[in-house]
Amino acid sequence: MSALTTRILVLGVVRIFGPANGYQLRRELLSWEVEQWAHLNPGSIYSMLGSLERDGSVERHDLVMEEGGRPVAVYTATPQGIAELDRLVLDAIETVPDPGDALPLRVAINFAPFLSRERYVEALDRRIAAFGLAVQGIMTKQAHLAGNRSVPPHVLAELGLELGLVRAQLGWLVEHAAEVRAGALTFAVEGRVHDWGFEPPADDPGWKMKAESEQYARRLGRVDGA
């Protein structure tokens, strides 16, 4: 897990669910099974929250929810953090340092609905162009090495695997971009923020988190207005 993908995940979940406390954010990310597919260490969530607070991407609010109670640290995304998340998501989609590593794209897709449809498609098109060049590069390398007895056969086999993986992602990208152009997915700027095309089950922990976040928001309103 790179610092980039950790930053996107933590900042993104704050943007979705804030105001929320660190435990809530950790619990939500673990419900996404980020330990498995994103290789995110749960302990790094709190570390990243601190980093995001220091650079102004999130704001920490210490709230006392009941008389005599201990303060609870809750986090909200700042305007700077919102702009930063959009930039990071676009960068993760467009930039292809390693065509064989799809993790930055997988992370970014979770927060693509914050973009406009047009910006998302443009980013996909840039990635498609980069993958087209990557395929050409691998095929050129294959042609150069073919028949060269100084090259171990298993190296050529691995190169074939790399080509297959890159072609597979390129095919998915082309199909996905076409679906989005045709109206697939929902994007926040389209004015349908309450209709994302799915409905979590009644026992989904997210409902409890939503209710708790609303309590924090009401408390923040009273504090800010005091």
Pin down the residues of each PLM region.
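A structural signal for alpha-helical segments
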Residues: 40, 69-70, 119, 126, ...
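Alpha-helical initiation/capping and key positions within long helical/coiled-coil segments
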Residues: 44, 123-126, 130, 158, ...
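Basic helix-turn-helix/winged-helix DNA-binding cores
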Residues: 1-99
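Charged, low-complexity intrinsically disordered regulatory/assembly segments
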Residues: 142-226
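Amphipathic alpha-helical dimerization/coiled-coil segments
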Residues: 86-136
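Short, flexible helix-adjacent loops and helix caps
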Residues: 34, 63, 117, 143-150
